[in-house]
Amino acid sequence: MRFPQPSPDLRVRWCSAYLKIDVCAAVLRNDERFRNIRTLILSGERGEESKQRAQYAIFEPDRADLRNGMKFKRHIDRFRPLRDWKEQQIWDLLEKYRVRPHPCYFMGFGRCSCKFCIFGNCHQFASAACVSRQQADRLIAFEKDFGYTLKRDTDLASLISKGVPYETITAELASIATSFEYSQPIIIPNNEKWKLPAGAFRKCGGPM
């Protein structure tokens, strides 16, 4: 076995395909609720995130679309309203409507993605290991079992040792972020000040 590879090619970066993209497509294709109706999928990619995402269409038929089907029709469009937005606009919108950012941003992460994302840099991995040491150790053990490393140029233990965990990580934030239940209000109450999280505008390893 091998880990998914940091590549635009979804055949080798299989985590994005099998665990995210194909899961949604499978539901749309197999659930009869989506037959003979019109469905709009809202997708949050921004062109600022990568060159490939900058080329995505803002509006197009979804990969699960079957609007010209013979037995039944499945009319599904995909809309990317944020494709041309800048990160500043996103934070401004969250502040305007008092939306609470995900706790990972308050810990210092610049992206809310998989905790040990294959695109992560040494500081991201060191921070993730700080939050979830047992999971990090399990990935390190997988490298030894597979005979292949997650990163092409280094092993995970060395990568983590080179990084510096974000100083804004706290036990409370780590507990909130890793809990199976989330009880904080999504909309911040009026008696609480909205705060820009430490991870805002932080450059991190991200999508290709």
Put a short name on every predicted segment:
Residues 1-208:
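Nucleotide-activated chemistry modules centered on ATP-dependent adenylation/adenylyltransferase
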